[in-house]
Amino acid sequence: MILVLCMAATAAYAQTDGAATATSTADSLRMDSIIHALPEVMVKGQRPVVKVEGSKLTYDMPQLLKKEGADNVYDALKLIPGVTDDNGSLTLAGNAFNVLINGKHYQMDAAQLNALLKSLPASRLKHAEVMYTTPARYEVRGASINLDIASDTSQPDGWQGELTGAWNQEHEAMWSERGAFLYHHNKLDIDFNYEHDHGKSYRTTDETSLHALDDGTTHDIVTDEAQRSRDHKHLWRMGLDYAFTENHRLSLSYTGSYNTEHAREDVTGNVTAANAYRTKKKMHDVMLDYQLPTGTTLNAEYTYYDTPSTQQLTSTLPTGELHFDTDEHQRINRWKFHLGQEHSLAGGWGLNYGVRYSLTNDHSWQAFTSTGDNTAAHPADSYSRQNEDIVNIYAGTNSKIGKKLDFEASLAAEYYHSPAWHQWNVYPTFSLTYIPSSSHVLQLNFSSDKKFPDYWTLQSFTVYSNGGYNEVVGNPGLKPSSNYRTQLVYVLRHKYQFVAWFNYTDDYFVQTPYQRHDRLTVQYKYLNFDYSQQWGLQASVPQRFGNWLDSRLTVIGVWMKEKCSAFYDIPFNRDIAWVMANLRNNFTLVPDHLYLNLDGMIRSKAHQAIYDLPASGNVDVGLKYIFWKKRATLHVFCNDIFETSGIDPVIHYGNQNMKMDFSCYRQVGVSLVYRFGGYKDKSKEVDTSRFKK
């Protein structure tokens, strides 16, 4: 309790009113630049929560969820030791991770990850398998969490389902309705999910910029920006699974979504402007998966993604006026195919190998139309149609050496072809788990990866915000980054976890602002740095106090360094150490029925490129009530009670001088979940990580 009160007081004291989630296309792009990454050993003395299986740490999610208010997968993942919510991005031991659904590939950026994971009921989760290094057979690289949501064949034939309604209030209200249904009969499963999110949002951004130009003039730009938006988001899925035998299964699924957004941005101060956005996003995905009892897997998937949007800008700046409309569009067609094989060999050895091929067609364009007298020419129209081909060949092996040692290694060779790049890459992975005794587990991991920019980022586009004073532009010359990561994981007494890691990223890229000298514009653009490196330590310590309080303290310490010798005319080489602490407390008020959650987080100041990021923190409280023979759950909560979770970045570096102040509102909400028929949801997610946001 003392720790809780200290953390609450610290979070209340931090002067960090800040960032709300960006809603428009321009602001979501601009916000990208501010912060983004054995023999079974079980817990004794209580029901097992985590066990070590080779290179995996497997968590019993129903046990972790029992006393928590999480009703969706996003909130459920935050209960896993080492997973934190870093300003809207989930991280594992301070780094980004992949999400797998029943071993299938799932990769998203922070915004898409939030939206899709929040649409999935937490009740579907059986286990979560944490892999700090993911073997090549899973198609992804780096750290991963595999979610086990296989259907429960022990349930009787008939219908099962879950209905959810939710209301969240910040400055404006958002509503959500979700229905998920499953029909089980003998060897056949048919499922259908639908979710509708809708409501309004409001946020403000106050920006101060001391802007020097080549003509010797200096402009003191002060703007106050208010943005109002209205959203409707629809997500649906239909799936069919037929199990011929235990290891012989055919699956067919269709997933679709349709989202609309209407936003208006009004700017006052040195810049006066009205800026209206309209966006529609449509996605259709069909996936066929066939698993044979011989260990062979066949998979084919087709995805269609279409995002038209418009912008209407009328603006008066100190240097002139802008009046024009913008139409932009991205259309993606993607095909994926996978053939894999696994063998169980003598002596406890395992062997897996396979080949993957994907073809993506990206059709993007942007057109400008003048609607008045402009003192500056708008950018030229752009048009692009290009294909991307990826061939991946992999092989891996795993084995148990004696009673104390497990290892798994894999190697993937990948050929990437696009108009910008033609190259082969090799990705080794290695994981070694050593168990000297039942109370100690040591795991050493190594992985390598290459990150490719979003398709839209590579286009010659320009999107305006802050009344046209800010420009978000593409970079066709942006190079992919190469990442190398090593971790050492130590599990003590089956519950205390400690992780040490080192990351090195060559050609690291991130979006950064720059006050141009030739004209009065702040340009936001993704650029390659020389490198980024990071040393980190994490400790996760759970503690139970009788039968009335369960607590877990997670502390992360990081030393990071970023170097860019070609950052316009102000190269930088910056390093900083920062610390983040997270304390979760769950009070049992009435066993099996009523629980109180009180959580807090605090983070010290940090750097990103030439940004200085101040300290931030938050305190959240929630009440969970289970009733109606445990079929209904009511959750009432208030997040960020003291409105201190936002980050207001400052730039005072070289000839760059800027400060941003983002609105920050506490969030209150209520959700009600009703389940019938012993419902266990299942879902397959679609990779839209590199599509236009």
Segments from the language model and where they lie:
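Short, acidic, small-residue-rich periplasmic hinge/interaction motif at the N-terminus
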Residues: 16-65, 85-87, 94-96, 132
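N-terminal periplasmic accessory domains that precede
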Residues: 29, 73-76, 113-115, 140-164, ...
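Extracytoplasmic beta-strand/coil segments of soluble accessory domains associated
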Residues: 50, 74-109
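Short acidic/polar hinge/loop motifs at secondary-structure boundaries
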Residues: 106-132
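Face-selective signature of the C-terminal outer-membrane beta-barrel domain
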Residues: 188, 233-259, 276-428, 435-439, ...
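Outer-membrane beta-barrel signature, preferentially recognizing the C-terminal barrel domain
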Residues: 450-499, 504, 524-536, 541-544, ...
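Gram-negative outer-membrane beta-barrel transporters
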Residues: 528-605
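Conserved C-terminal beta-signal and adjacent last beta-strands/turns
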Residues: 575-693
